[in-house]
Amino acid sequence: LGTLAENILEEASGKSLTAGEIVYANVDTAMSHENAALVIRWFKEIGRERVWNNERIVIIFDHRVPAESIKTAEGQKKIRNFVKEQGIKYFYDINTGICHQVLAEKGFSRPGIVLVGTDSHTTTAGAFGAFATGIGATEMAGVWATGKIWFKVPETIKINVEGELNKGIYAKDVILNIIGHLGADGANYMAVEFDGEAIKKMSIASRMVLSNLSMEMGAKVAFVYPDEKTRKWLEEREAKPYKFVLPDKNARYVDEYNFNASEMQPVVACPHSVDNVKSIEEVEGVEIQQAFIGSCTNGRLEDLREAARILKGRKVRKSTRLIIGPASWEVYRDAMREGLLDIFIEAGGVIINPGCGPCLGAHQGILASGETAISTTNRNFQGRMGSPESFVYLASPATVAASAIEGKIADPRKYLR
């Protein structure tokens, strides 16, 4: 009667399991970004000469690319040297994209595997049916050395989303509605399984939004069941071997929640927490100085298409800066071929190279004190995108695009008629 989390961990450990047990699992893929520099330090302290498997470690530069400080440059150099010395096969330098997007594009995110990453939003790969979760640098050093990791088998909650998404409502609105309902710790150390008509109809890109943001309600892992769409994506990506793992018919869930997508409105997460969710009507008219469309949450092609639909033939308000950051160079080039980048430039937007910069307040558009931003990213904690005296609202790409035009938070639906 296993849940999806239990079934995958059983496969990875060779034991039969139930929630609450401690298990040692074999890791399929271990991903790090620039914080690999820290992992290297701990790995050397363990005293191992070689990593357990140089074809199962993936390193992707994305947080501060190209390097914005001497400290970052030194860290990146240290990692490049380690990659060379260990013969790590899958190393993606500053010209690839954001780690969670790259894992998907290169066929690493796939059903039935255990995937760990030194980034909290590693849960994104759950959209493909992977047991994917974030771990710390010391923990990752242990994985690099042994290829194994211990977990407490999480309990599972099931979230059913039925109905149809109306015009102007996107996966981002769905998950923010859910987080607003469950709260920031509503799924603490739990596995989440998403099901229902609305989820089945979603594209892979939209499903990634759900799994990505589930971290913001405390989820350990967040699954969308793999299906034909998943299979098609993986075939196109020449993915590594995988098998579809699903929950058993009568799996035990600690809780089940039901939502109706047809009743959902565009929503915005207000400062300074992701569960401070309000309907667009409640926050319409709040002045903004910056609008950001991009990140591992909403920087994919479908997101940029929606933003371009709204921005086409219109101008960003003079008092507002619009920054666009595609999630990867693959997305960037697709957007370029489709003429989307032209639309953004024509509207007065600034396009940055793929990376995490603005989302974590590292570079490429940091907020000053007293400034307000609306962003498609996944966190709005105090000081997240710059000054501790700045304010961040989170919304869908359509809502952010509409707000950039007006210089204040705006309902995207009036631009989609």
Residue spans for each PLM region:
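Fe-S-dependent hydro-lyases/dehydratases of central metabolism
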Residues: 1-417
